[in-house]
Regions:
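Acidic-glycine-rich active-site phosphate/pyrophosphate-binding loop
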Residues: 1-11, 44-58, 233-252, 285-302, ...
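Glycine/charged-rich beta-loop-alpha catalytic/anionic-binding loops adjacent to active sites
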Residues: 10-20, 56-65, 249-259, 299-309, ...
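Early transmembrane hairpin of solute transport permeases
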Residues: 28-127, 131
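Hydrophobic alpha-helical bundle architecture
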Residues: 37-40, 66, 277-290, 300-366, ...
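Flexible, glycine/charged-enriched surface loops at secondary-structure junctions
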Residues: 2, 44-48, 89-94, 115-117, ...
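A structural signal for small-residue-enriched, beta-sheet-centric alpha/beta enzyme cores
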Residues: 2, 21-25, 55-59, 63-66, ...
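Signature of multi-pass transmembrane helix bundles
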Residues: 109-252, 417-425
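Conserved phosphate/anionic-ligand binding catalytic regions in large, soluble enzymes, centered on
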Residues: 20-36, 255-272, 313-318
Length: 425
């Protein structure tokens, strides 16, 4: 059995990470910040400046904002949040936007009231919303987490200043307690009632948007094409539904997703494949619940080394967790689960993140293919030897090294990706 402190921390991590969000999380964060700033200002802004870190710009530039009438870009997210967002709804801040709000947003965008500036900051998730109306001004800063307001100033008066927080301390539960052995023990022994509500919400929400992605018109229709092109086997069903969910989300669908590590795509990738597998295999609900607990915590564990935003594609981490979760559901012992992780990370640790967009769905499909291959290799007793490439003696060490590559080694890559994305022909 786990120490009570570890048990409660893991429950806390799941509750903090597995929250509903509507649309891609970076534009939603901007909309939330703008809605909060407008609330402090107390009136409609006449001028707005959005100062954004490079990773915020990268992840907002190409993605459709939900409930916007298919608008894209930082200006649209900020202005829509300012005129029609409800900050009390957190990551669902745009869920109540109506036609009047969309119309007013377009009017203000036509007047070009919002300008965007690159914020030179060592913090990858960092932006400042500045608003002005008449003689009144507001500046609101968000850092580290998508709705973590660290500073608010109105008319030169500081209303809030909590910049002592970091990415690690802006949340309550202690993520440093995460490790593979305890994650497995927790998944095996957790009281189902302690996690049932959040797990069932993830199943319900993420499968709903998966089916919407299969039937609706979003992006390239990748889910349908996968289903129609390949044999109707387990992997095809997992890849098609998971990719469809991502494509719908990136394509502006207003249905909520239960996220993981601040990302809807990661929440989708670490859950939908397991749900499909469990239903196809007709496994009991409790087996799926425990596997989803395992997969979600394994995703968080990997991301604590990489950070919420980087040049490293988060679909790899979440798909790696999904593959390990399938091994867990298939009765694999911890040693076999570790082999699944190592086999995945030996294959696809080099996928870059070039921003949130509909092609994220294709990256998820490719990553799941690698993860399912890793699962089958491990279940057949096969794994790559330690020190094959970046692999270490233990899967936990390999996860740490991959995180080091993503967080430190790819910093210059991240800058170059942003430079290329911002080039104009």
């Amino acid at each position: 059995m786990l120490d009570e402190r570890i048990y409660e921390s893991y429950i806390g991590i799941l509750k903090e990470e597995m929250v509903p969000a509507m649309g891609c999380t970076e534009p939603i964060a901007l909309a939330y910040g703008a809605a909060r700033a407008r609330e402090v200002l107390g009136k409609e802004p006449e001028h707005i400046t959005a100062k954004c870190s490079g990773n915020i710009i990268k992840n907002v530039r190409c993605v459709i904002i939900p409930n916007s009438g298919e608008l894209t870009g930082i200006e649209a997210g900020v202005v829509l949040g300012a005129v029609a967002g409800d900050p009390s709804l957190n990551m669902e801040v745009l869920s109540k936007v109506n036609e009047s709000g969309r119309k007013r947003c377009c009017e203000l965008l036509d007047k070009k009231i919002c300008k965007v500036e690159l914020l030179d900051s060592p913090v990858v998730l960092h932006f400042i919303i500045e608003m002005q109306a008449g003689d009144d001004t507001v500046s609101l800063e968000i850092k580290y987490d998508h709705i973590n307001v660290t500073k608010t100033v109105k008319n030169q008066e500081v209303l809030l200043d909590s910049d002592h927080k970091s990415e690690e301390t802006s949340v309550a539960a202690d993520r440093t307690l995460l490790n593979l052995e305890d994650i497995k023990t927790f998944a095996d022994t957790v009281e189902i009632d302690d996690v049932k509500e959040i797990i069932e919400n993830q199943i319900r929400s993420n499968m709903a948007i998966a089916h919407e992605g299969m039937t609706g018109k979003y992006g390239l229709g990748i889910g349908r094409i996968i289903r129609e092109t390949y044999s109707n086997d387990m992997l095809t069903k997992m890849r098609s539904l998971t990719a469809a969910a991502s494509e719908a989300r990136m394509g502006g669908c207003d249905m909520p997703v239960v996220i993981n590590s601040g990302s809807g795509n990661q929440g989708i990738a670490c859950s939908v494949p397991l749900i499909v597998y469990a239903r196809e295999m007709e496994l009991p609900d409790y087996v799926l619940y425990r596997a989803l607990v395992f997969s979600n915590l394994l995703t968080v564990y990997q991301k604590q080394y990489i950070g919420k935003l980087s040049a490293f594609c988060g679909a790899v981490s979440a798909s790696c967790a999904a593959g390990a979760g399938i091994t867990y559901m298939g009765g694999g012992e911890l040693s076999v689960i570790k082999k699944t992780i190592e086999n995945t990370l030996a294959n696809i640790p080099g996928i870059i993140c070039d921003g949130a967009k509909i092609s994220c769905a294709a990256k998820i499909a490719a990553s799941l293919d690698a993860a399912f291959l890793a699962h089958h290799l491990a279940m057949n007793g096969q794994s790559y030897a330690p020190y094959t490439g970046i692999l270490k003696e233990e899967a936990g060490e390999t996860i740490s090294c991959v995180g080091q590559i993503g967080k430190e080694g790819m910093k210059e890559t991240d800058k170059e990706i942003l430079r290329i994305m911002l080039e104009r022909v």
